[in-house]
């Protein structure tokens, strides 16, 4: 009897987990604080979301955005980083102060809840194209040049 209850609870737990959104899904508006504690919003006008769940993906996005002059960066681009895996003391006293030196804003998901449904691949950056909250495409890149090329279209 205990085994049956255990298996049933495992089945329930897997169905209760958030599913990653895919192409043709409609996402909800997102609001996060950036590294300056200002709101950063994914709204109806947002066409590009750059997303990183790990350090490597974040480095790729940073290199891509730093390589583009400010006037060449798409206006409707939002960068979001899931920093929930980072120890809070490291985030507070080391990482976020360094992020304040960057020439762009990045939404910080400190708990990982907001971005739980965001697609990601290990050591890669995700580039999500939106049209009024509808997911048009999802690509994962392992080079900053490829990210720059994708968002410059």
Which residue stretches match the model-derived regions?
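N-terminal signal peptide c-region/cleavage motif recognized by signal peptidases
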Residues: 13-17
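Cleaved targeting-peptide boundary
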Residues: 18-25
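A short beta-strand-turn-helix
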Residues: 29-46
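Thiol/disulfide oxidoreductase modules built on the thioredoxin-like
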Residues: 43-44, 110-147
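Solvent-exposed loop/turn segments at secondary-structure junctions
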Residues: 55-57, 83-87, 112-114, 135-136
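Short, internal strand/loop/helix patches
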Residues: 78-79, 95-120
């Amino acid at each position: 009897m205990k085994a049956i209850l255990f298996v049933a609870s495992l089945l329930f737990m897997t169905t209760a987990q958030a599913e990653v959104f895919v192409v043709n899904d409609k996402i909800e508006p997102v609001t996060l604080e950036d590294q300056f504690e200002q709101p950063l919003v994914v709204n109806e006008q947002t066409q590009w979301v750059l997303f990183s769940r790990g350090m490597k993906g974040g480095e790729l996005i940073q290199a891509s955005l730093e390589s583009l002059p400010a006037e060449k960066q798409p206006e409707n681009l939002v960068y979001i980083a899931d920093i929930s895996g980072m120890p809070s003391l490291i985030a507070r006293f080391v990482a976020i102060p360094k992020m304040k030196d960057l020439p762009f804003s990045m939404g910080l998901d400190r708990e990982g809840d907001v971005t739980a449904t965001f697609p990601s691949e290990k050591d890669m950056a995700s580039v999500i194209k939106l049209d009024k909250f509808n997911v048009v495409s999802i690509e994962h890149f392992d080079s900053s040049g490829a990210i720059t090329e994708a968002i410059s279209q």
